[in-house]
A protein has these predicted regions:
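Macrodomain-like recognition of ADP-ribose-binding/processing modules
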Residues: 1-181
Length: 181
């Protein structure tokens, strides 16, 4: 699938392996432990090597001894990945939609973008947060993700470009179909 540009070219939807993105930062759909896991989280930890885990351990010892709260974000090195930074955020587990999941997912995107802007990063790449093992319905997650990024970019110059990186063309198409009505 070719890249699709939205929001005056500031949002780019593409497919591929997020660990191979050459953006200044990639976002990790982490768990609260920050110790790596399955899916994107495991792939990022494996691809970046031990430097990511070591920095996550230091974060756990310091700021977040009980784990990173859902909806928050922290930045680490990207180790041996192409990106310079990994922004770890913890998405909500889907419980039917009545447990504040949309607000928590919005916070994941907003906090990740704030962290990128604080570092003066020009671009950042997101996976589809919470749509894997956490069970967030992909259409609903697409609506939340798009709205959160659109709102953030409307009032912030940085990051200049946001990528949504989908592993499969089908998921990218579903996202585009959802946000284009």
């Amino acid at each position: 699938m070719a890249e699709t540009k939205l929001l005056d070219g500031r949002l780019i939807v593409t497919t591929g392996d997020i660990t191979k993105m050459k953006t200044e930062a990639i976002v990790n759909a982490a768990n609260t432990s920050l110790m790596g896991g399955g899916g994107v989280d495991g792939a990022i930890h494996r691809g970046g090597g031990p430097a990511i885990l070591e920095e996550c351990k230091q974060i756990r010892k310091g700021r977040y001894p009980d784990g990173l709260p859902t909806g928050d974000a922290v930045v680490t090195t990207a180790g041996s990945l192409s990106a310079a930074h990994v922004i770890h955020t913890v998405g909500p587990v889907w419980h039917g939609g009545g447990s504040g999941e949309a607000d928590k997912l919005t916070s994941c995107y907003r906090r990740s973008l704030e962290e990128a802007a604080n570092l003066r990063l020009k671009d950042v790449a997101f996976p589809a947060i919470s749509t894997g093992i956490y069970g967030y319905p992909k259409e609903k997650a697409a609506e939340v993700a798009f709205a959160a990024v659109r709102e953030y970019l409307a009032s912030s110059k940085l990051p200049e470009t946001v990528y949504f990186v989908f592993y499969s063309p089908a998921d990218a198409r579903l996202f585009l179909d959802t946000v284009n009505g």
